[in-house]
Amino acid sequence: ITLQGLATPLAGFISPGNRAWALQLPAIDYDLEKARTLLLEAGFVVQGNQEQPELRDAKGNRVEFTLIVPVESSARVQMATVIQEDLARLGIKVQVAPLEFGEFQRRTMQTYEYDAALLGVSVSEPDPSSYANFLRSSSPLHQWHPKQSKPSTDWEARIDELLAAQARESNPERRREAFHEVQRILADQLPVIPIVARHSASVVSRRVVNYRPSVLMPYSLWNAEELFVDQP
């Protein structure tokens, strides 16, 4: 809805466009009834009515959180609103808080004063090592259990081991196996919830010769020295 179909739903952390390294994971389908069942099995209770349900924990506390989003990105603000509406159907109250980018970055990168954040992650190249700054437990860009002197969990320690192993491995298949295990761990633990991979599109005049857009940045000008305009 918010991206006009110009995106691919994600089942894992890596875009399926990264065909060399992305692991094909089972799709996560929208299933409201299954979500309700899982919440009830976990001990939550639903109060209110069908039009305005209220989800509460076993102690009677209302399930609610604030979702911060950079106000400069209208698409992400719209996505946050869709998330808010979807979770309301389960009785979960979400307060969407659009923030100026500087304040958004301060909270997500410095003070960590937020419940949940809607952000984007991009890498400069498809190689697995380019994801290390976000996945490695000691990285300043690591969003869950931040600023770790050592891994807080066994599964994060395992990811650290796998990232180090694939970085020193010269065999492509063994590198792929290690990075696939990283993706399986992330899909199981779900420290971040993947939503979509946005599509990139470029438009150029037919008069431009040698235009060959790339999937990597800079998408349109990587071969700038070869581009020229064919005069009529």
Name these PLM-found stretches.
Residues L3-A7, S15, R19, T37-V45, ...:
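Sec-exported extracytoplasmic/periplasmic mature domains
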Residues I1, A11-F13, F65-I68, Q95-P98, ...:
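Structural recognition of the beta-strand scaffold that forms the well-ordered cores
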Residues G5-P9, N18-W21, V71-A75, F101-E103, ...:
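Solvent-exposed loop/turn segments at secondary-structure junctions
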Residues Q4, T8, D29, E33, ...:
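Conserved structured core elements
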